[in-house]
């Protein structure tokens, strides 16, 4: 059945969030009102998916309808706490705007004309087109992208079986800079022991809005215990408002301040010399690189007074090793992302806070923990080994630049899909398969994305909603929500081993299916069935658990299991508790720590303050240093963005409860700037640059620099399902140019714009 936009269903109101159901044939959307509270009640443990951190949860269900979600008390770091996004999962499941049947585009891309089809027809047509593209252009011409985490593993399994090396997560548009910096220096990332820190410095990392429930609670605990917090941020974020000090740093000035702090620590010998000598390489090159980066120099670069830089550095060092410079998350402020994140890790290294209470630490999975304990404390997870699984032979499109070798091995440079499609280099991309990925909100330069999808031969979107990106697809495959599916066991180890399990809470609505099942069935239609030896998720879970039925039962009952005691390798009291628990543990060092067991997966086996590998890949990048770059023109204002506590990037603006909580992203304007432009709060304004033009509303506030404008990201969608949050506000991607930072491969989230009244 085919239908035009004029014949589509009319909108049904849910508060202010569901402005219209958009353009769908009858039966394509969900109709599932929440049942009353009378009836059989169950509590099911699972994992949240309202953001990428996957907090353990419990869902209360009445008559097969989810009515309440809370944190899982079996997970002590979080307990029953949950954020607004996690609690809104009820609204997600029962949203009448959900896609619940496969659909095929019948009109121009993005115009919203769809036809309901069967799963079999969808699989047959998509597989036929993929195989035709493979035959003509090679399997590498099909790109696969997904949100990070469990959603990506099954899609990437399909990509590998199909023969394509081009798999991507959203990492290059969000957290990759931090992870790549850690990989360059140490071979792997580090976590924060926030609850026990005495001093924390943040460069734009806003844990009170970019919420990670456990870390956010730890931050509150640290502040209650008297820890000092210092925020360097161009705007007064929620974290800045709760910090002891807020310094309105110039956008892009972070690296200069970090280099100056390093200069002070080395010049005044405030660093942990014994740690540096034992665990690092390249200190001499680092010291030479920061010899001239004085606080006075940085003050001119960043608008932070020199005496503030000196004082904060001294205070930070005085609290070491129980002190942290937060490595951050989504915040590519400039082209110098890789060096900024490296300098943050470098300051932590100079503090000697690695594997110390209130510092940074390596996560300890079952294999590591069991080895140290001298016995099997926690079960290890078996890795799926598929016999004769093919290995793609073509080069990845993002490895045309060798500097991206680190991110290519992880989430990849997703915006390279645009480059390849538009330039046909190193070879053309002809198809794009997306799983819960909304690049139209997260990738910069929206106009380039439109050009990209318009010239592709095939675009497939697997999603819960008709997102802005899904609106440009040829086929929509309805995925069920995280509360309607089972998934693999997740390793959530931190200071000791821990596993968690996402399991089905309620039955799927309509014909929606789990993404693992969708990609498995498409793989079978592609003739790749031999690479799918499992029949259901329970079989795969049991394989991971090495056939341990008792463990599987316990994990399903509790949803979260952990083993052992917290272990910090260089903290004597922590090691004492560990060895008391496990008498057969390996011998401690003479100082009663496990300092000799601290290893790093870098080429030298140490923390590399100077990277010979990076210097070879990109001359001049061996050590961090400031380089000339421009974020805006002289007549422009800085344009920056950030996260808000009630939304996740561009993913949750469709969820009714969250859309009601926040449905617009007013532009923060300093009173001085507003007066110069004749602008008042609530006025309609234009932001414009060479990339695009956006209309929004002004919010005049002193909580922003006079030369800077700020908005929350994820609003102002120009296609897809219509809610209050998607139809209002500034679309950030329409104002950010297509700029990729070196080495990290991340998109730059700062630009220049002009401001005027509408």
Swiss-Prot record:
Keywords on record: 4Fe-4S, Iron, Iron-sulfur, Metal-binding, Molybdenum, Oxidoreductase, Periplasm, Signal
GO CC field: periplasmic space
Catalytic activity: a quinone + hydrogen sulfide + sulfite + 2 H(+) = thiosulfate + a quinol
Cofactor binding note: Binds 1 [4Fe-4S] cluster.
Domain of life: Bacteria
Gene3D superfamilies (UniProt xref): 2.40.40.20, 3.40.50.740, ADC-like domains (2.20.25.90), Dimethylsulfoxide Reductase, domain 2 (3.40.228.10)
InterPro entries: Asp_de-COase-like_dom_sf, MoPterin_dinucl-bd_dom, Mopterin_OxRdtase, Mopterin_OxRdtase_4Fe-4S_dom, Mopterin_OxRdtase_prok_CS, MopterinOxRdtase_cofactor_BS, Prok_Mopterin_Oxidored, TAT_signal
SUPFAM superfamilies cross-referenced by the UniProt entry: ADC-like, Formate dehydrogenase/DMSO reductase, domains 1-3
CDD domains: MopB_CT_Thiosulfate-R-like, MopB_Thiosulfate-R-like
Modification(s) after translation: Predicted to be exported by the Tat system. The position of the signal peptide cleavage has not been experimentally proven.
Signal peptide residue numbers: 1-30
Molecular function via GO: 4 iron, 4 sulfur cluster binding; metal ion binding; molybdopterin cofactor binding; oxidoreductase activity
Chain positions recorded as [4Fe-4S] cluster binding sites: 48, 51, 55, 83
Record domain 4Fe-4S Mo/W bis-MGD-type: where: 41-97
Family: Belongs to the prokaryotic molybdopterin-containing oxidoreductase family.
Subunit structure: Composed of three subunits: PhsA, PhsB and PhsC.
Entry protein name: Thiosulfate reductase molybdopterin-containing subunit PhsA
Taxonomic lineage from the root: Bacteria, Pseudomonadati, Pseudomonadota, Gammaproteobacteria, Enterobacterales
């Amino acid at each position: 059945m085919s239908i035009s936009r004029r014949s589509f269903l009319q909108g049904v109101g849910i508060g202010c969030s569901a402005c219209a159901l958009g353009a769908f044939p009858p039966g394509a959307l969900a109709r599932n009102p929440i049942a009353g509270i009378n009836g059989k009640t169950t509590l099911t443990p699972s994992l949240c998916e309202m953001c990428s951190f996957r907090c353990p949860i419990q869902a209360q269900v009445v008559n097969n309808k989810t009515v309440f979600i809370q944190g899982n008390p079996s997970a002590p770091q979080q307990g029953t706490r949950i954020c607004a996004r996690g609690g809104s999962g009820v609204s997600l499941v029962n949203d009448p705007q959900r896609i619940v049947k496969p659909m095929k585009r019948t009109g121009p891309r993005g115009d919203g004309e769809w036809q309901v089809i069967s799963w079999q027809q969808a699989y047959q047509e998509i597989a036929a087109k993929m195989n035709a593209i493979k035959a003509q252009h090679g399997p590498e011409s099909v790109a696969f992208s997904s949100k990070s985490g469990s959603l990506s593993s099954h899609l990437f399994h399909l990509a590998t079986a199909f023969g394509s090396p081009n798999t991507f997560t959203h990492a290059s548009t969000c957290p990759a800079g931090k992870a790549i910096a850690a990989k360059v220096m140490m071979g792997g990332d580090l976590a924060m022991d926030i609850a026990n820190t005495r001093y924390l410095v943040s460069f734009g990392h806003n844990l009170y809005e970019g919420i990670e429930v456990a870390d956010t609670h730890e931050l509150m605990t640290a502040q209650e215990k008297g820890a000092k917090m210092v925020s360097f941020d161009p705007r007064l974020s929620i974290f800045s408002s709760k910090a002891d000090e807020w310094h309105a740093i110039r956008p892009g000035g972070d690296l200069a301040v970090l280099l100056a702090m390093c200069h002070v620590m080395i010049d005044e010998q405030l660093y942990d010399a014994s740690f540096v000598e034992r665990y690092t390489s390249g200190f001499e090159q680092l010291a030479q690189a920061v010899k001239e980066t004085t606080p006075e120099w940085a003050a001119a670069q960043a608008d932070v007074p020199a005496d503030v830089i000196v004082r904060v550095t001294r205070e930070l060092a005085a609290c070491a090793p129980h002190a942290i410079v937060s490595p951050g998350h989504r915040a590519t402020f400039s082209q110098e992302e890789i060096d900024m994140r490296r300098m943050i890790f470098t300051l932590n290294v100079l503090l000697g806070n690695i594997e110390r209470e209130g510092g940074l630490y390596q996560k300890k999975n079952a294999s590591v923990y069991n080895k140290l304990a001298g016995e099997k404390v926690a079960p290890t997870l078996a890795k799926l080994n598929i016999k004769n699984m093919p290995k793609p032979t073509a080069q990845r499109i993002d490895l045309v630049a060798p500097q991206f070798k680190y991110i290519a091995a992880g989430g990849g440079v997703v915006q390279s899909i645009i480059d390849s499609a538009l330039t046909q280099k190193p070879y053309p991309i002809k198809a794009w398969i997306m799983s819960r990925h909304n690049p139209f909100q997260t990738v910069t330069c929206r106009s380039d994305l439109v050009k990209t999808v318009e010239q592709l031969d095939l675009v497939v979107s697997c999603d819960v909603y008709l997102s802005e990106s899904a609106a440009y697809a040829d086929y929509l495959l309805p995925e069920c929500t995280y509360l309607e599916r089972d998934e693999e066991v997740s390793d959530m180890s931190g200071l000791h081993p821990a596993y968690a399990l996402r399991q089905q809470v309620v039955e799927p609505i309509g014909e929606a299916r789990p993404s693992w099942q969708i990609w498995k069935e498409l793989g079978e239609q592609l003739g790749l069935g031999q690479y799918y030896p499992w029949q259901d998720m329970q079989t795969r879970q049991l394989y991971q658990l090495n056939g341990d039925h008792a463990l599987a039962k316990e994990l399903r009952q509790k949803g979260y299991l952990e083993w052992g005691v917290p272990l910090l390798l260089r903290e004597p009291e922590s090691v004492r508790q560990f060895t008391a628990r496990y008498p057969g543990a390996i011998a401690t060092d003479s100082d009663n720590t496990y300092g000799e067991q601290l290893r790093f997966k870098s080429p030298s086996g140490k923390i590399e303050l100077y990277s010979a590998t990076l210097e070879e890949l990109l001359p001049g990048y061996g050590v961090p240093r400031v380089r000339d770059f421009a974020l805006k023109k002289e007549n422009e204002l800085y344009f920056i963005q950030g996260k808000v506590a009630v939304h996740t990037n561009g993913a949750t603006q469709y969820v009714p409860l969250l859309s009601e909580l926040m449905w617009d992203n007013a532009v923060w304007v300093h009173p001085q700037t507003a007066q110069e432009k004749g602008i008042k709060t609530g006025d309609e304004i234009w932001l414009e640059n060479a990339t695009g033009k956006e209309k929004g509303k002004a919010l005049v506030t002193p909580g922003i620099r006079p030369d800077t404008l700020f908005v929350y990201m994820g609003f102002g969608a120009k296609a897809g399902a219509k809610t209050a949050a998607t139809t209002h506000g500034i679309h950030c991607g329409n104002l950010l140019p297509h700029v990729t930072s070196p080495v990290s491969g991340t998109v730059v989230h700062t630009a220049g714009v002009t401001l005027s009244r509408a």
